[in-house]
Amino acid sequence: MRNSSKGQDPNFSYDSILSTPTPSARRTIGPRAPKSKTTYHKPPSSIESVSTLIQPNKSQSVTSPYVKQFTFSSKEYNSHNKHALQNSQLPLPKTPEKSTVHRPKANKVEVTDLPSSSSVEHLHTSKHLKGPRLPKNIIKSSEDVQIAPVTPPVHSRSFDPLPKPPVPSVPVSKTKRRTKHKLAPVVEVPEITNEVSPKFTSTNDEQVYRLRSIRAGSPNSVCSFQFEIPSTRPPSLDQLIHLFNDFLRHPVFDFDENAIEMLQSCTPDEKWCFIRSNFAGFDDPSFQIPELAAVHRPVSWFVIQLWNKTISNLQLITLSSLLSTQSDRWISLFLELQGLRALHNLLTYFNSSAVVQPQQAEVPRCMLTLLKKKPTLVTSNSYIFQAITVTLISPNLLPRKVAADLLTWVLSLKEPLVVSILETGFKEINAEYEKEVPLFFGWIKSFKDIILEKELARTPPSSPARNSASSSPSNIAFLEYCTSTMEFINQLIVACEELEQGFDLDILDSLRESGIHEVIQLLRNFPDQQLEKQLNIYESEEERRTISQTTHEDVDSFMSNESSILSSFNEFASNEVGRLLESTIQNILLAKGTEKQKVKLIKVFNSLLQRILLNSKVSNESFEDSLQASLNMLTERFYSDDTARNALKEAKASRAMAEKMVIERDAMAAQVNLGAEDLIAKLNKEVEDQKDVILSQKRTNETLKTEIDALQKSHVTQIQRSEVELRELYLLINSDSFQGSTNSKERIIEYLLDKLDLRKKEIAAESTLWSNDGIDDKLRDLREQMSRQSSQPSTVSTILQIPDKKFHRPFPRHLHRYVGRSASESLTSEKDESIKSMKGIDDFANLEIPGKGIESNVVIKDISNQTHEINSVENKAETVSNNSKITNFDIPNDATSLPTIITHPTPPPPPPLPVKTSLNTFSHPDSVNIVANDTSVAGVMPAFPPPPPPPPPLVSAAGGKFVSPAVSNNISKDDLHKTTGLTRRPTRRLKQMHWEKLNSGLEFTFWTGPSDEANKILETLHTSGVLDELDESFAMKEAKTLVKKTCARTDYMSSELQKLFGIHFHKLSHKNPNEIIRMILHCDDSMNECVEFLSSDKVLNQPKLKADLEPYRIDWANGGDLVNSEKDASELSRWDYLYVRLIVDLGGYWNQRMNALKVKNIIETNYENLVRQTKLIGRAALELRDSKVFKGLLYLILYLGNYMNDYVRQAKGFAIGSLQRLPLIKNANNTKSLLHILDITIRKHFPQFDNFSPELSTVTEAAKLNIEAIEQECSELIRGCQNLQIDCDSGALSDPTVFHPDDKILSVILPWLMEGTKKMDFLKEHLRTMNTTLNNAMRYFGEQPNDPNSKNLFFKRVDSFIIDYSKARSDNLKSEEEEASQHRRLNLVNNHKEHVLERAMSENNKMDNEAMDGFLDKLRNVKLESHHKPRNRSAITMGKEHLIEAPNTSTKSSPAKNELFVPKRSSVKSDLAKVRPRYPKGSESTDGLSDALNITPTKKGEVSSKAKKGYNYEKRRSGRQVSDSYVLNKNSKNKSNKGRSASYTFSDPSSLEDSNRQKPFNGEKFRRFSSKSRRGSQNRDSKKTGKARKDKGINNNQTSPQNKPSKESLKSDTISNEKKVFPQKASKVNLLTPTISNGTRASKHANEKENTFPRGVENNLVAPMIPNNTELNEDTSAVSRNLENATNDLKETFPTTTTISTARAKPGNNDINTILRRNNSRGRRRMLQQMSPLKSNKFSGTNDLNFQQATKPDGSNKSSYMERLEKLKQNSERHLQSVGGKKVYSSEETPVNKILVSPSVSILDHNRILSQSTPIKSPQRAQEMLAGLLSGKLAPKENEK
């Protein structure tokens, strides 16, 4: 057998071929029998013989001994088949060997005429479609086709016996076959109908016992084949035989005749077993599964679909893809199964069908793919091209286009057979025309009809939609079809020319006759670059072929003979033709322009003459017609400006599109590189954003729906209300009382006015809630006008009256006219005059005074008329100068001309001002009128002569053109040789020779032409080397190199801008400027920080800098040419070079470029934050609106406020801003606010409102945001992204041709732009949702959402309320806790109250009491020696080191009176050092304590200097004792000290003597200081006693005896002072040591704010009185025990106090006895005065030790100590309390006398306790002594020593 497509030998054996593992090959039953006979079980039916489809000279070569010719008819075959079915034992019918049946020839192959599946004959293939292999020899015949079957020889080893028929009960097993016997699969061509084969059905159950193929669905659907096999054996033998015959003909089997004959001889049982055992072979998934994709189908499936014509368009596309991608084996199998013939059959069916099928375009595409894979099929299967040619007139454009492309490719192979088949195809197309037409007439006519339809469907040329429609898909498909068709025509012409055979007549003439020129003319109307190219190719080819084929004998002979040309020219020279020809040549040569332009001009004339000559020779037209046609053809070829412009636009658009495609490709590649996880994460994020947007939209929709429902209800209510009003009004009018009344009209008006007022209120409320701005501005103005009219009497005269005003109209250059008018003029005349004046003024105001160097082209018309109109406005004054005023104005330096009446632009600079009278002023307008009148007569005023022009440039020798110096040396050598004869130029510039050139008028001079001698001289110069010597001798020095070496770089940029560049690019200081430019152009990530700077106005708004750097610019829009080639940018400095290469060079799109980068960076940086903030604000608004607790709290506040307010201030609601006023409403004592009361109320009575702060946690976060700033930022980003999209689509960024070649802005922006736009859409939706939610929430709470301030403060007010409420709650809780703690402390103190006096009167203290009585008697009996002496106020000299600043003292206060200052006993230093209190910063921690306790910190083994010296006072010259004590603390700085003046106290009395010697004290300062304190003390005394101190010489620390108060006055003062609290003003000179009281009642805030060392006299630690009595030595141990007990009690009472361990005082310390002994009588008297009772009590609270000495009848105030104790017991006002044997005082009372109960208490703790109390006066000295005695803490006797 021979396969024609593969070129195999006819005797080729299939033993060596391995079949593909397809189901059909795998399921072939049994081995093949030896082929000894050539019998056939199914002869093929005949097919139409087409002469053009048969390959010439190939059928005779196929000869073989096995060739036999048979021809069968369908009728004969059917009769044989039917006869065989009736006889089961007979084999299949055999065809006689030499019988032939002739069938009439048909025009077309009709598939429906084929009777059965075997009706299609397959040619040129080695395999048949059904039954045995087909014969290969094809004999050409005009009427029939003789088929000679060829049977290949069978190998001797290939015979195997058939399997025995199996037993029905035993399953039949397949016999193993050798692989070499496997054959290639054979596919069946199923029947289209089942009408031919008879159906044998059972009469009983009517069951089908036939194998048949069922086609289901439409032709386009995927069909499945179902093979019906009966489950039981057919009852009839005929049915079984028929089923068996069909079974054998199935394509899965490939039996030869011997095998079929042996199978036919089997018994019916064996046949049925054979059928049942092999039925499993039909169960092929690739055939049976309908849902299986076509790409997974086998080759045979596609072939079956093609033959059945049931293949869909998608399956054809899949087949085309498989044909281009599968292996050669797959394609070979497709060809072996007659796939190409099936495609041809299907295409023929589509061409003949009246119904347009979408698969028609895919069939040629499959053919093209197959032919490209196997180019040999073009010659072996050339019959397919006839059907493809017919496809050129398909109703659809796409099949035409694909067919044209296929034929173009085939013609490129230059196969002659193809051209002849194409001719047959075109003839078939023309078969429908009765008369004879050109070959291509039918095809070209169809082509032309399509173009005309498209032309009619186009919009008019003037329509703006025409350009937009050109890019529609239909237009693109049409243009592609036209381009493919023209390409096919051009290829057809070229192929016919190269093959030199083909069509009988000339192809170009046939195309012309078919109307190709009309088609080309129509196609010219469609602007397409590719189509234009093909049209030009055709026209050029036609022109070339026409010229080459036309014989021009006369012309050729004429042009070839030069002598004839010259003779003809000589003949014409004398007549008119010669003159015109000479004139034409002269005009061409004299034409202006360069040589290239002259060449173009000559080409135009030459082409025109050639065209005219050619047309006159070729056509028989007249000369005029030929000339007109030539001109038309020539002008059509010229490109117009519009065409060129459109071409440029298209080129730019194409380039932009290409770059966008590249960018999209890169973006897709980047997405692919992301990987699955990143891509999924990105998509999930987008889905989440979309979900958020959808949820927000749902919320918004629900809100809008609610609002719409409310509006609908309101509308219905309003309609009902209106109806009610109308009915009421109707009833009112028709009522009897109304008709009888006289004031009925007034009643109606009153009723309507009431309703109107009510409606106004309702509308106002609704507008507040819903409208944007409340009342419209226009409506508000109208209301104001009506109110004014209603308030004033409105008359016509008042309405028409126009107030006096001055008409202010600015003139050019600050030239003002003030036009006034009176109110007495009528309205009409005033209107006319104002119109005239306005017109004139506007005309004059439109003038422009040009600046320096600007041409003036403004025309002023009728200035006099304008002046007249202005004058008429000015009440028609007699003269212009009386009323018109023109202000003088300054003329800038660059303004040098006033506009004048001119008809042509004046040359720059303009002439000076014609009417200028002085330096900076203009003349009166009258003079302007004079000038205008003169110019009206003269017509044109002569202009002033222009300034002299700049010096002209160099004039070149050739043509007298001006040549710049830089170009003067660049003249071509030819021009130079013509002028000077020199052909050589110097290598470098030489010194110039200055002479007077003679370049003209040399005709009759010596210089007319060079003589022979001159030529010799010139040759000598060239050869002798003189010119070389000139080069060396007269060479000029290169100034450029010297400038480079000596001069620095040119610097145009300002220093400030250079600093900015240096700051922003400091990280890149090590890089080259070109590298920085490259990084910026490549949009490097490291340059994002500089984007803001490079796009700022400081950088861009530099006009002077740009102008200076303009010569260095590179014009990238014109191909990157330098603007000025002489300028070298390398001369510039670093930042100037950077500026010119970026901002100046790319100035056309730099702003948009940087803006794009800025928008991108901002969106990438702030998008997430903005979305989060918008969501937060929306969520906060929803939480606030939905919070029931907060709304209940607001109602509670409303009810409380309405309860507090009067009736006028009652409210139904309040704004959120009112919450901020709650902390400002205080109670009567100003201690608590309404917010404190609200907290208490909520905690006691409304606990459900207590926990509203956590519900509003989001509101607290939203309060930190600025809503207005967020809205503005979001709007700017959205607007910026939209502008960026516009710039990339049609703006500055849409044309990449003007970009820098290295600029990658589009590659960065475009991939991101889609994502950025999507983000901005999301952000826009979030912003809209936020605004909607917030506005609804604000309206819900009664706020104004249109007020930006209210919107910004909405959440902040709520947050402020939450913070204030939390503070109030904390204050309440703290106050309650302190009250509870104080109550507990009071109970503890009250428990020990009764034990105080008992301990004082106990026997243990008897000796102490007696000693005290003796001590008091001694004091009273002291003789006052020097009281009569005048008090000397000499200065006290003290050292600065003894002055320390007392904290918290006032400058106006004086030391407390009635104080006895006692020096302290010394303590043990070691115990004190262990527990030292903390002191404020800036003061030494131990100074005050050491001084107070007489402790000096010393190093180990040293003795204190104070202990060595002893604390002894020395009597001063003045006789005054200044101080008896020293102060505890030095200067302590605290917050409470701010603003208070420091008071100075004496630090250590014992060191006064040494300090006086070292550094004298400023006595004058001290006197002023003491006098101020004293005056302050006197003022306080005078307020209480009504008496002023008379003795001003007494020290502030003592009290005069005259001022001692009585017992009753003290009692009344004490009671009255309990109601008032006055702050104490401490003295400047605090000479007391601090005292401590346990009964301090402190305010809670004072404890936190007061200093560690509180101000006041109570800070002084007062030591107990230690009398110098020797009897007390015995009781030292008892005193120590009492001291320890008191210390322990204090520890229990004040557990936080720091205890200082006590010890015996060292001998030598001074006590009160020593001081009294050493002092004079004056000091003793002062002691006695201080022991007097307390004079007055200024402060509230009960005196803790209010000792008041009883006055005896004799006037003396002496009493025993026991008497005073008895009175102390009886006094009810003395609330002495006993705490463990010591005296303490009630915390509810404010003590006047702070008494140190235990010296072991820490000084710091004393101050802490005292800081909680109200400052009061210090106690008396005697009271302090008594308190010390009562507490049992008497000093031991060692103090005296």
Swiss-Prot record:
It is found in: Nucleus. One of its GO terms (biological process) is barbed-end actin filament capping. Its main location: nucleus. The modification Phosphoserine is found at residue 1541. The keyword Cell cycle applies. Residues 1499-1516, 1554-1567, 1605-1621 have a biased composition (Basic and acidic residues). Residues 674-715, 1260-1290 form a coiled coil. Keywords: Cell cycle, Cell division, Coiled coil, Nucleus, Phosphoprotein. Residues 740-972 form the FH1 domain. It comes from the Eukaryota. It holds the Pfam family Drf_GBD. Residues 1-63, 78-134, 152-181, 1445-1661, 1696-1715, 1735-1758 are annotated as: Disordered. One of its GO terms (molecular function) is actin filament binding. Residues 1-25, 46-63, 1447-1456, 1483-1497, 1539-1553, 1594-1604, 1630-1641 have a biased composition (Polar residues). GO terms for cellular component: cell division site; cytoplasm; mating projection tip; medial cortex; medial cortical node; mitotic actomyosin contractile ring; mitotic actomyosin contractile ring, proximal layer; nucleus. Residues 1568-1577 have a biased composition (Basic residues). Residues 232-620 form the GBD/FH3 domain. Gene3D superfamilies: 6.10.30.50, Formin, FH2 domain, Leucine-rich Repeat Variant. The modification Phosphotyrosine is found at residue 1544. Interacts with profilin and actin at the FH1 and FH2 domains respectively. Belongs to the formin homology family. BNI1 subfamily. This is Cell division control protein 12. It comes from Schizosaccharomyces pombe (strain 972 / ATCC 24843).
